[in-house]
Structures are given as C-alpha cells and as structure tokens.
Regions:
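Hydrophobic membrane-insertion alpha-helices, especially the h-region
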Residues: 1-13
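A structural signal for short, hydrophobic/glycine-enriched beta-strand patches
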Residues: 16-155
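A transmembrane-helix-recognition feature enriched in membrane-embedded lipid enzymes
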Residues: 147-170
Length: 170
C-alpha cells in the first residue's frame, strides 16, 4: 500500500512543484486573483495593466470566529477598472471556478486570467477547465510569499487534485 501511495504521489508532486505554465495573453476581460490573494495584489494590478482587463476579481477570506469578511484596501474602488471582492461558495478552488463561470455569464466575459500561488497552479487549472465555461489562463504568482513550498503544502495540493478528479462543479 505504501508503494502505491508513493507511486501515485510522485507525479502529483511534480505537477505541484513544477506546473505547466502558460504565457500571459495580450488581452483578457478579467483578472481573478484567487485566495487568499493578499501577497500578490501588485502582480494582479500589473496583469490588469498589461492585459487591459476591465475587471479585477479577488477572493477574500472570512474570519472563522465571526464569519465576517476580511475586506482589504485592494477592494476599494479603482479609477482604472471595476473591482469585485468576494467569498466564493463553497470557499474552495472549486467554488472559485464556479464563481468565475457565474460572473462570466453575468458580465459577458469571453476569457480570464487567474492568478494563484505556484503550488496551486495545477489544481486551479483542473477546476477552471472543468467549471469556468470560458478560456482561462492560469498564471503563477511570483511574490516571495507565494514561493514558499513545503511538504505539507505539496501533500495538501496533491490531495486537492485527487478530490478534483471525482467532484463535479457546484
């Protein structure tokens, strides 16, 4: 059983540690910084400028003790683009993909760039491909905090990928 677990984990870990990266498109309708996005907001704003996106969507967190949303200054209105800060339901990558699908239908977006932490790229791509209903380019966050990867994180992302193989879109 242990050998089977190791054999299954090695390819998953490689996908987590060295995900397939896509070039950033010249233009997109929306940039979605999935959560928690606090550390890579500078990169999200840069992507907004580079792609000419009209809307920035950001997943924000919830205080587990109070259920209150953690609103941040990056949720303040921008003179350059529309800002939507939200808590997806469910509060998972799967929920973020379904949220993007629903927002894309409501706002008539035809494509999106999704920004996430490096270990999360592969799992994000699985959910976005399955649920978003529009072409999505997944971009790896490059800030220092996003670069920290540990064994626990690899195991968590790998487990999330496995769960993603059996769950459907909300």
């Amino acid at each position: 059983m242990l050998v089977l677990l190791v054999v299954a984990e090695v390819p998953l870990a490689i996908g987590v540690l060295r995900p397939r990266l896509e070039p950033v498109p010249r233009r997109t309708d929306v940039v979605y910084a999935i959560g928690p996005a606090d550390f890579h907001m500078a990169q999200a704003r840069d992507l907004m400028r580079r792609t000419g996106a009209s809307t920035l969507v950001v997943t924000i967190s919830v205080d587990p003790r109070t259920g209150e949303e953690y609103r941040k200054d990056f949720c303040d209105p921008s003179p350059h683009w529309k800002v939507i800060c939200l808590v997806p339901d469910p509060y998972t990558t799967r929920g973020e993909a379904a949220t993007l699908r629903d927002l894309a239908a409501r706002h008539h977006w035809s494509d999106a760039v999704v920004l996430t932490d490096p270990p999360h790229v592969t799992r994000t791509r699985v959910w976005m491909d399955r649920c978003a209903a529009i072409p999505v380019t997944v971009v790896e966050a490059t800030d220092r905090a996003s670069r920290h990867v540990n064994l626990r994180g690899v195991a968590y992302q790998s487990a999330g990928w496995v769960v993603g193989q059996v769950q459907s879109c909300p």
